[in-house]
UniProtKB/Swiss-Prot annotation:
The keyword Signal applies. Catalyzes the removal of dipeptides from the N-terminus of oligopeptides. Most efficiently cleaves the synthetic substrate Met-Leu-methylcoumaryl-7-amide (Met-Leu-MCA), and slowly hydrolyzes Leu-Gln-, Lys-Ala-, Leu-Arg, and Ala-Asn-MCA. Is likely involved in amino acid metabolism and bacterial growth/survival of asaccharolytic P.endodontalis, that utilizes amino acids from extracellular proteinaceous nutrients as energy and carbon sources. This is Dipeptidyl-peptidase 7. It is an enzyme of class 3 (hydrolase). It comes from Porphyromonas endodontalis (strain ATCC 35406 / DSM 24491 / JCM 8526 / CCUG 16442 / BCRC 14492 / NCTC 13058 / HG 370) (Bacteroides endodontalis). It holds the Pfam family Peptidase_S46. The C-terminal Lys-rich domain (711-818) is dispensable for the proteolytic activity. Residues 1-22 form the signal peptide. InterPro entries: Pep_S46, Peptidase_S1_PA, Peptidase_S1_PA_chymotrypsin. Its EC number is 3.4.14.-. Belongs to the peptidase S46 family. GO terms for biological process: peptide catabolic process; proteolysis.
Length: 818
């Protein structure tokens, strides 16, 4: 450990990256440049660009899918088998669960295709095509006189372009902005709507650790679930039919049993949802104060009410499990983000960037071109602060907090439903009521109303408070009881009867319904608040667009990947642990031992079924084990955010080694500021997934369906066998370079940081022991006159003699005297 620390210190002094340093960013595969690719090869990537990404052809990326409405998945067999996270499949598993068949608690396994469960409403999307439509957008907006007009033009043209690429419900085109609105692509997908549940572990595995461990390392969660995509007889996307057959994909991922070592190449491909890496300091403050803070307060109160009821009743737990998980995920994310932004002093980092931008403007006499950008953003953020906070409080409380307002919206829309659409409308309502409890929501409503009264500006509050004050003397609890006693909206049976009435009778009932009255008060309040903020928000978007474009001109060599927007991206890096704080170090993997250390039968988050504990205790890990242990989760320094859940993690050969499911607590600020020393992706080891499928679910037919890759196990490779080189400070290297006991491997961590010119060490001689070793040359960085890396003999000392030759000690003494 001490030697590693010394090496790292030398590398930092030299200003040369180590092999384990990822490139910041979520890269567009269709824009992958030579610089990216060369760096990927340095880190250990072995495939060609075409093998990585080639739409319509077999490639690594062709097997990656959008799973549902906000996750990623990976195709792993020639019969449409999909691996994704347990929390991504959680809603699907919950939808099939009952008290008698509790698949959340007990897990699910199918013995054949017939037993696989269709999931209504679930879809999987395969990327079909990406087309640059920027010229069409730019030509259309050229004459726009305002940001509002510009937005309307883009929206209308986008709808037209979408229609050009969309074919029914199975091929969908979506125009999407990139680079802060400076570029536009239409992204086209094949949409498969017959997706079936194949296998899911018990929640004690798939959700082990619950909210306590969410966003945390160490982790011991088997966060995976298994689905299958079905297609019609011609292998085309289709709606559900018993006649459909398993989909034959263009590509599917090989699954590696060979493991990984620290420093090994790791790559994720997925659909990250949203990042804001190019915000100004005022934008960061807006996120902290006006977005995250309302979310933290409101969801904390709502979730406490839900949790008490869920722990008291099994049926309630099943109904609200998915809702609670979705709510708490971003509640804890917001807490961690605010903490991280403060700890990393991100606001002042952004201010430093702004000062550099202003200095560049002054140096280039560009005040007339760019001088308005930052002052405009500062002013617009200041104007929008109060209304932004009001909007977020209204959304979190009365729109997203209590459920009755949106139910009232749906019931109230009955008059606009055409006869042909009525069956679909009734089916949607039935799904909503299936997981709704009026007895619980009646407790949430007054809590949400109280927050609105306390936090939202008086002129933005819904006028329902006048009624509450007049009739109930301000008591929100009495008002809530009144709503739930007098309204038909909270009760599925009453709504069902209501839908069978003539239209005139329906209107009379709705006109008098107190829940509908609440909806008719809340909606205008939100819309009015949005109207007030719209111009300011559009001006902010304009400023962000201009700031991004100008920043690229200021520093044309700076790599500025587009922010995430739920389109396909790649992140490359290495398997790597991290230091969460001074004096602490987190290992890069966990094992089954941690389950025994954490498990607690008295805790709903850490209770594990005896059969699972017995299975792990038996150590019958077979081909999935590492010695007498089973690796459960691991870390890599890939870039991750929401939407990446379920993203495949590939090794340098394009083989699946894990499924990404989380980020770490110390780097929750990563959506705004990527911190390479801290930011880590948490993934479930694919061998834990296979172990549960094989040994727990006893589904050998699924294991046979996979393309398993077996070879030398990376985890156990000794020195000289493709693991640690025999060179005393080398960390990783290619097998062929170390198989004969060479002291140095091509592109090893030591040699990259050690060579005078920064290039990889390619020969044994370059790393041999003695005065001329690359290892020793690294020490010369400290003898530089200006403290910068040694790049030539003249730079090292005043004498101008050799950087690391016989005069090394003399050079060092001269430098120290200076």
């Amino acid at each position: 450990m001490k030697l590693k620390r010394i090496l790292l210190s030398v590398a930092l002094l030299c200003g040369i990256g180590t092999t384990a340093m990822a490139d910041k960013g979520m890269w567009l595969l269709n824009e992958l440049n030579q610089q990216n690719y060369e760096r990927m090869k340095e880190l250990g990537f072995k495939l060609s660009p075409e093998q990585l990404y080639s739409l319509g052809q077999p490639s690594v990326a062709s097997a990656v899918v959008i799973f549902g409405g906000g996750c990623t998945g990976i195709t792993v067999s020639n019969e449409g088998l999909i691996f994704t996270n347990h929390h991504c499949g959680f809603g699907a598993i919950q939808s099939q669960s009952t008290v008698d068949h509790d698949y959340l608690r007990d897990g699910f396994r199918s013995n054949n295709h017939v037993e696989e469960l269709p999931i209504p409403g679930l879809s999987v999307r395969y990327l079909r095509e990406i087309v640059d439509v920027t010229p069409r957008i730019e030509a259309a907006v050229k004459g726009a006189k305002s940001e509002m007009e510009r937005m309307q033009i883009i929206e209308e043209l986008s709808q037209k372009i979408n229609a050009e690429y969309t074919k029914g419900s199975t091929v969908v085109g979506e125009v999407t902005p990139y680079y802060a609105g400076n570029k536009y692509y239409v992204v086209v997908y094949n949409v498969f709507q017959d997706v079936r549940l194949v296998m899911a572990p018990p929640s004690s595995v798939g959700k082990f650790g619950g909210d306590t461990d969410n966003w945390m390392w160490t982790r011991h969660t088997g966060d995976f679930s298994v689905f299958r995509v079905y297609a019609d007889a011609n292998n085309n996307p289709a709606l559900y039919s018993q006649n459909n057959k398993p989909y034959k994909p263009i590509s599917y991922a090989p699954v590696s049993l060979n493991g990984y070592r620290e420093g090994d190449y790791a790559m994720t491909i997925g659909f990250p949802g949203s990042t804001n890496r190019y915000l100004t300091s005022w934008g960061v403050e807006d996120v902290v104060n006006n977005e995250n803070s309302p979310r933290i307060e409101v969801r904390g109160i709502k979730q406490a009410i839900w949790k008490e009821a869920m722990e008291a009743d099994q049926a309630t737990r099943i109904k609200y499990a998915s809702k609670y998980a979705q709510s708490s995920n971003y509640w804890k994310n917001s807490i961690g983000m605010n903490r991280g932004l403060k700890n990393l002093d991100v606001v002042n980092r952004k201010r430093a960037e702004e000062k550099a931008f202003e200095a560049w403007i002054a140096k280039n006499n560009s005040q007339s071109t760019y001088g308005h950008i930052l002052p405009g953003l500062k002013a617009d953020y200041a104007k929008s602060a109060a209304i932004s906070k009001d909007i977020n409080y209204l959304y979190e409380t009365l729109w997203g907090g209590t459920e009755i307002v949106r139910l009232a919206r749906d019931v109230n829309s009955v008059g606009r439903i055409q006869a042909a659409d009525m069956p679909k409308y009734k089916g949607r309502l039935e799904e909503l009521y299936k997981d709704y409890l009026p007895s619980l929501d009646v407790k949430v409503l007054p809590a949400m109303l109280d927050i609105v009264r306390q936090r939202v500006s008086a002129d933005c509050q819904p006028d329902i408070f006048k009624f509450i004050d007049k009739k109930f003397k301000g008591s929100t609890e009495k008002y809530a009881q009144y709503v739930f006693e007098k309204s038909i909206v909270p009760y599925a049976d009453k709504v069902k009867d209501f839908l069978n009435l003539p239209a005139d009778k329906q209107k009379k009932i709705l006109d008098k319904d107190p829940a509908v009255a609440l909806f008719n008060s809340v909606l205008p309040a939100i819309m009015q608040a949005q109207d007030k903020s719209e111009e300011m928000m559009l001006n902010i978007e304009k400023g962000k667009r201009e700031y991004f474009a100008a920043s690229r001109i200021m520093d044309p060599n700076r790599q500025m990947p587009s922010d995430a927007n739920f389109t396909m991206r790649m992140s490359y890096g290495s398997i790597k642990g991290y230091a969460p704080k001074d004096g602490a170090w987190y290992n890069y993997y966990t094992t089954e031992q941690g389950v025994f250390e954490k498990q607690d039968p008295t805790s709903s988050e850490f209770a594990v079924q005896p059969e699972i504990l017995s299975l792990l205790r038996s150590k019958d890990f077979g081909q999935y084990g590492v010695g007498d242990h089973l690796r459960l989760c691991f870390l890599s320094d890939n870039d991750i955010t929401g939407g990446n859940s379920g993203s495949p993690v590939f090794n340098g050969n394009g083989e699946l080694i894990g499924l990404a499911f989380d980020g770490n607590w110390e780097a929750m600020s990563g959506d705004i500021e990527f911190e390479p020393d801290l930011q880590r992706t948490i993934s479930v080891d694919i061998r834990y997934v296979l172990f549960m499928i094989d040994k727990w679910a006893k589904m050998p037919h699924l294991i046979k369906e996979l393309n398993l890759v077996k070879g030398d196990q990376r985890d156990l490779m000794p020195a000289g066998k493709g693991g640690n080189c025999s060179h005393k400070k080398a960390q990783t290297c290619a097998k062929k370079e170390c198989s004969k006991g060479k002291k140095c491997a091509e592109k090893s961590a030591t040699c990259i940081s050690a060579m005078k010119d920064g290039k990889p060490c390619k020969t044994e001689k370059a790393c041999a022991a003695g005065q001329k070793s690359a290892e020793k040359k690294a020490n010369c960085c400290s003898t530089m006159k200006d403290g910068k890396p040694c790049t030539g003999d003249k730079d090292c000392a005043k004498s101008g003699k050799a950087c690391c030759g016989k005069n090394k000690e003399a050079a060092a003494k001269k430098a120290s005297k200076k």
